Amino acid sequence: MIAVNVAGLLHEAPGATRELRLRDHYASLGPDLELAGPMDGVLRLQRTNRGILTRGTVMAPLRRTCARCLDPYVEDVTVSIDEEFLPSLDPNSSQPLQVDQTDQTLRIDDHNEIDFAPLLHDELSLTEPMHPLCRPDCPGLCSVCGAPLADGVHRHEADELDPPLAPLARLLDRRND
């Protein structure tokens, strides 16, 4: 959880700003995103006439798995944040504001806190490539034995055949006889 209390900023005039520094910040962003180290970034929180506008960039080293060789690797990812959070309570009266349940607007909770973890999770998840590679020229795995091809010389006997295809090879041999 990366929660920041913005009660003071909500009581200031529009245009007031605060800076949030995420230096050496570790956070759990869910089972599908694993940080390999601390996040680093700067978020600028600005009071608007409706809520708090958050802008900035965050860098996070993410653990990924190569789609070719299945080896883990670390990729440094930088995301830009540009979102407005609206209060769920009126800043002056502390009375609940009317919120449409279908509204997808990011909200400041009843304790005047913004939890950035869900937003960072979503932004960092969008950086996941369709086909993650540890390096562009990754040779992958041997189709016969499954060993990593990057480990060096890899040989098999020429007559080795994938067991599911063995019956087809026998039929082909009979046809050629």
Residue ranges and their predicted role:
Residues 1-177:
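Structured interface patches
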